[in-house]
């Protein structure tokens, strides 16, 4: 039976749509991480990727602040990310909506730190959730065959970068 894997932080709120489209039960893997760690990670990426002339766009957070005439600083960046039009709010709200609509049995939560600390154990849990057979993975020789254009999309060059070794790189 084919397995479709897609990523979108809003899928948790759209279970009936997904099931109507794929004509089978949806199973959604929900990555979770402490909010302070997410904010620190995004701020680190912003500081590591300063806007340069010729780039398609400024990072998506500062772009919003400039557009709304809000001073650019870390506090305002975090505030925007947590506001109803920010990506953290969007993710949290979509998950809440899915739970409120009774779809929590279709969700499997994967904590970032658990994945980094015990990747094979977490993947085994994911395989069990999906009804698939688990197999051993190598976490010291990773590659990404499908690069995303994060500069154009987010103004951040390494937002979805896959390192060759699975390890925590920022708090």
Region spans (language model):
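PAPS-dependent sulfotransferases, especially Golgi type II membrane carbohydrate sulfotransferases
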Residues: 43, 51-52, 60-109, 117-171
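Phosphate/Mg2+-binding loops and adjacent switch elements
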Residues: 40, 54-55
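Short, well-ordered alpha-helical microsegments
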Residues: 12-16, 22, 119
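Short, flexible loop/turn elements at secondary-structure junctions
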Residues: 9-10, 35, 114-116
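Glycine-rich phosphate-binding loop used to anchor ATP phosphates in small-molecule kinases
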Residues: 1-17
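Conserved phosphate-donor/acceptor-positioning beta-strand/loop module used by diverse small-molecule
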Residues: 7, 18-46
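Alpha-helical elements of the RecA-like P-loop NTPase motor core of helicases
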Residues: 13-16, 40, 124
């Amino acid at each position: 039976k084919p397995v479709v894997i897609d990523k979108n932080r809003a899928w948790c709120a759209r279970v009936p749509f997904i099931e109507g489209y794929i004509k089978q039960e949806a199973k959604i893997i929900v990555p979770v991480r402490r909010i302070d760690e997410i904010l620190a990670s995004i701020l680190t990426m912003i500081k590591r990727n300063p806007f340069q002339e010729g780039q398609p766009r400024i990072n998506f957070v500062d772009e919003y602040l400039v557009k709304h005439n809000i001073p650019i600083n870390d506090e305002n960046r975090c505030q925007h990310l947590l506001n109803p039009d920010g990506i953290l709010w969007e993710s949290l709200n979509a998950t809440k909506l899915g739970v409120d609509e009774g779809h929590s049995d279709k969700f499997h939560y994967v904590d970032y730190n658990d994945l980094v600390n015990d990747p094979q154990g977490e993947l085994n849990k994911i395989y069990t959730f999906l009804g698939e057979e688990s197999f051993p993975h190598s976490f010291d020789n990773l590659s990404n065959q499908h690069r995303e254009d994060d500069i154009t999309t987010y103004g951040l060059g390494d937002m979805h970068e896959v390192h060759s070794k699975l390890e925590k790189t920022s708090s």
